[in-house]
Amino acid sequence: MKKKLSWLGAIPMGIALILLTWLGWRKWADPLIDFGQQLYVPWRLSRGAVLYHDVSCLYGCLSVCYHAVLFKIFGVSLNVLLASNFLIVIFLLLLIYRLFLKCSDAWTATTIGLALTVLAFSQLLDVGNYNYICPYSHEEFHGIVLAVVMMACLARWLEAGRKLPLALAGGCLGLIFLTKPEVFVGAVAPFAVAVILQWRRLSVLDLAKALLLAVVCGLIPLAGFFAGFRSEMNSADAARAICGAWLPLLHSTGLQLPIYRAMTGMDAPWHHIAQALIEFSGLAVIVGLCAWRLTRPTLKPLERVLIFAAAGGVSVNYGWQSAGHCLPLLLVVAAILWRREWRRSFQFSVSSFQTEHLKLETWNSPLFFPALWLAFSFALLAKLGFNPHISHYGVFLAMPAFLSAIYLLLHLLPRFLQSPRPEVHSPQPDRPSDAGQIGLWTVDCGLKSFRAAILIFLLAGLARLTIHSSLFYTDKDFPLGSGGDRIVTYDPKVDPTGAAMASAAAWIETNTAPTSTLAALPQGSMLNYLTRRINPTPCVAFGSELWAYGEQNMLADCAKNPPDYIAIIQWDGSEFGAPRFGLQKGFGYDVMQWVGKNYQPVWLIGGEPLQNGAFGIKILKHLSTPVPAGPAKPALP
């Protein structure tokens, strides 16, 4: 009965998921930036194109190949990706809830699940895509999900010592290699922690055999993809294909670009360090005051209510969408308190811990997963450098650290504040309902009030994030695309991008042949997908991929297979080192010169793109392409 009741904490997560789905239905994607590639590349692969040969991709091959298979089975539609992502998000929520329930309690696990739900469906910036339903990179999303599965398997391996969980963990790590480098590096950290923990109780030979098993299982997915690519190209190219996410880093890391300097805080490191200290100090004051006042035996009910109201009021009025600078410091505190829990729950003295091999039954299994999760949080947060935040890329990279902070505030910190009691051991300590009995502490009334105040503080913050997202979603009422490909984007009065993209797609479908080819510069592969027009060059996103492939290489691809039409779309390139695409050498200048010599304009909507910042789309046809019939220059509504 208790085991069934422990799952009741998932009900609030389900309610939040339904509410947030209704709030942002089909409003998660951006019509211009990034997400078009997430649709266009799998569509091309489902029609027989070869990844990294016919169409480029900055990231690994796993996600696009998975989506291409879905398109082949269920048909080409945004709905297919939405259904897949919803199922994966639900699986991720239940898995993380179950894992934290085992190492904490229902309140902590439920709050963590709610926080993940809010992040998964949020829009914290004016640009979409930074969510789990229509992500800017499915490789990031899938890699993190696989990392969580890997950690669940590693925790089971540490608990039971069986080979199957380890083999599955190795397979997950191999799949993560095919997503994004930062996720793979982040996943290696908990794997290393698991090996260190096992080293304390396994012989060198047994540990070597275990690692060999993990390595072999990790190579299986790589071998499978290598065989698939080998059927389309030679062995050297196939080997490069399975390393597709890593090869651009050999030419340039992109760290010199303004977007990455701002993301990592390298543009103003001392400012971000100061902000982290201020944020951490403010949180410490709030938590300290709650602990000081609410744990007193003489606390009056009215004072308790006032503290609860103050905690909620402070939180709901704080700018959570820009928060996260103090996450590294919170992770350090969480690691210290986890270490304390580990040592106090250990049945041997410190000296015996250092000298003796330990038997399986002497280990406190609920503490395994938090150790792995904290290692993953540290490693993934490292890419954000001095500027950790839960918005933008932080929706993915800071998510584990954000959940770790909740685990610290609702579980580790209250256990630290509790008074020691005689040790209580459960006959079945791995049951979720008994997880609270495994430590050395009991909960008193004052700490229940303290946890309630922290819970109110966190829930108010999640409400603030939801309200912030809803303000963006309220402005979105313009449909782009139709049927299963429909995206709801900003009203033209707020942002003309969606309306201009819809007009451009309609013009292309009306005035060009279905077999005509199209390239969008410097961004805009959504047009290719919506109109089902192929880009004959491998280049998908000229503006954001120049740093990886080089302008001359991309220009050579265009000259070799010139598209029938080119859509030039307004795009701010300042994040990549220039005010606009085509203004300077190395950032589209030669490409735009080539376009000017070989193409002539046939249609314009809005302002002249890449000139004065006003949004507009101009379509040009190749000089050898027959002139299309149709209107010459409609205006924006």
Regions found by a protein language model. Give the residues of each.
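Hydrophobic/aromatic-rich transmembrane helices and adjacent perimembrane loops
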Residues: V185, S322-L337, L381, P388-L417
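Membrane-interface transmembrane helices that cradle and orient dolichyl/undecaprenyl
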Residues: H142-L168, V195, R200-L202, A276-L299, ...
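Extracytoplasmic catalytic/substrate-binding loops of multi-pass membrane glycan-assembly enzymes
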Residues: R26-V41, L51-V69, V76-N79, N234-S235, ...
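Perimembrane helix-loop-helix junctions
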Residues: K2-K3, G186-L222, F226, D237, ...
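Short periplasmic/luminal acceptor-recognition loop of GT-C membrane glycosyltransferases, typified by
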Residues: L58, H468-E545, L555-F576, I605-N612
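Membrane-lumen/periplasm interface segments of specific transmembrane helices
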Residues: K209-G282, A382-G385, G461-H468
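Membrane-interface alpha helices of multi-pass inner-membrane proteins
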Residues: P165-P181, A187-V195, V216, I220, ...
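Transmembrane-helix motifs of polytopic, lipid-linked glycan transferases
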Residues: A83-W107, T111-I112, T117-S122, V149-C153, ...
